[in-house]
C-alpha cells in the first residue's frame, strides 16, 4: 500500500526521483498515465493489469467510455526506474500535470500521484477546508 507525501524536483533532464519507500513496494517498473485533477497516476504492473481488466468490461457503445479510454491509454507509459530511482515522463504527461520543477509525490493506497507543487498546494488547501464534510459523507466506511 502506498502512502506518504514526498517533495522532489525534476532534474535538468526532466527526470523525477520516485522515493525509495514507494519503489520498494513494487518491482522496477510502473505504468504512469493521466490522473484526475491535473496529476499523474502511477500504478504497479499488478495493479495496472487489474485496471485494464475492469476497463475492458466497459461498454464501447458509450461515448464517455470511449473518450475516457482514449485519454487514459494514450497518455499511459510503462517505465523502468533508472539506477537512482528516476523516471522520465513523456511531454504529454508533464504538460497534463503542469510539471516544471517542484513536484509532490503522494501515496494513495493502490497508486501514487505526481503533482506540480503549486497544484498540490491549491488542492490540499481546498480539500482541507472540506475534509470533515467529505469524511462525513463517506457513509459506507466506518473509520
UniProtKB/Swiss-Prot annotation:
Record's GO cellular component terms: cytoplasm; nucleoid
- Could you tell me the keywords of this UniProt record? Cytoplasm, DNA-binding, Repeat, Transcription, Transcription regulation
GO MF annotations in UniProt? DNA-binding transcription factor activity; transcription cis-regulatory region binding
Question: Where does the record place it?
Answer: Cytoplasm, Nucleoid
Q: Which InterPro entries match?
A: MraZ, MraZ_C, MraZ_dom, MraZ_N, MraZ_sf, SpoVT-AbrB_dom, SpoVT-AbrB_sf
Q: Which GO terms describe its biological process?
A: negative regulation of DNA-templated transcription initiation
Name a Pfam family for this protein: MraZ
Q: Is the keyword Cytoplasm in the record? A: yes
Query: Which family does the record claim for this protein?
Result: Belongs to the MraZ family.
| Quaternary assembly | Forms oligomers.
Instruction: Please report the name of this protein according to its UniProt entry.
Output: Transcriptional regulator MraZ
Source organism of this protein record: Lactobacillus helveticus (strain DPC 4571)
Gene expressing this chain: mraZ
